[in-house]
Amino acid sequence: KESAAAKFRRQHMDSGSSSSGNPNYCNQMMKRRRMTHGRCKPVNTFVHESLDNVKAVCSQKNITCKNGQPNCYQSNSTMNITDCRQTGSSKYPNCAYKTSQKQKYITVACEGDPYVPVHFDASVFLPATPLPSLPRPHKHRLLWLEGNNSS
């Protein structure tokens, strides 16, 4: 079975290339990376940075994930990414996508040992406030989640 880290690489990493000037980039890549098997994945982001740079995000700005989990991290700088969004008229098995190249901060969820990206959470134009500067209850909850019940 594909590991979460390997799935992240397959679905989100496209180092050393870009989508610029290729309106068919998403149609080609979504198919090539098996995100149109059985259904059309509606939205997906490819990151055009080195795997090392993306792995490094796991030690950058700790923020809350969209699902409320505390193991998300936002990049310190913007990254070259491509957003792929299924067009309204396309239906499986003929998945069609709109390709948009952008420079944005990325947010990934990290897990494991080594601590690596396992989920692409979001991309934004403006950086978020890191978790430690949030009000106190969050700190207690985080400590508790880490199994440190000294509070």
Curated annotation (Swiss-Prot):
Native source organism of the sequence: Capreolus capreolus
Any GO molecular function: RNA nuclease activity
- Family recorded in the similarity comment: Belongs to the pancreatic ribonuclease family.
Q: Which residues are glycosylated?
A: N62, T129, S133
Question: What Pfam families has UniProt attached to this entry?
Answer: RnaseA
GO BP, one annotated term: defense response to Gram-positive bacterium
Identify the coding gene: BRN
Which Gene3D superfamilies does the protein's record reference? Answer: Ribonuclease A-like domain
Q: Which InterPro entries match?
A: RNaseA, RNaseA-like_dom_sf, RNaseA_AS, RNaseA_domain
Q: What GO CC terms are in its UniProt record?
A: extracellular region
Which residues are the active-site ones? H12 (proton acceptor), H119 (proton donor)
Q: Which PANTHER family match?
A: RIBONUCLEASE (PTHR11437), RIBONUCLEASE PANCREATIC (PTHR11437:SF24)
Q: Which UniProt keywords apply?
A: Disulfide bond, Endonuclease, Glycoprotein, Hydrolase, Nuclease, Secreted
Q: What is its EC number?
A: 3.1.27.-
Write down what this protein is called. Answer: Brain ribonuclease
The residues that hold substrate are K7, R10, K41, P42, V43, N44, T45, K66, R85
Give the location in the cell: Secreted
